[in-house]
Curated annotation (Swiss-Prot):
It is found in: Secreted. Expressed by the skin dorsal glands. Keywords: Amidation, Amphibian defense peptide, Secreted. GO terms for cellular component: extracellular region. The keyword Secreted applies. This is Peroniin-1.3a. GO terms for biological process: defense response. The modification Valine amide is found at residue 13. Its main location: secreted. It comes from the Eukaryota. Belongs to the frog skin active peptide (FSAP) family. Peroniin subfamily.
């Protein structure tokens, strides 16, 4: 997914 890469943080890291 590109959504997690556009975010500066990871809510599901």
């Amino acid at each position: 997914d590109a959504q997690e890469k556009r975010q500066p943080w990871l809510p599901f890291v």
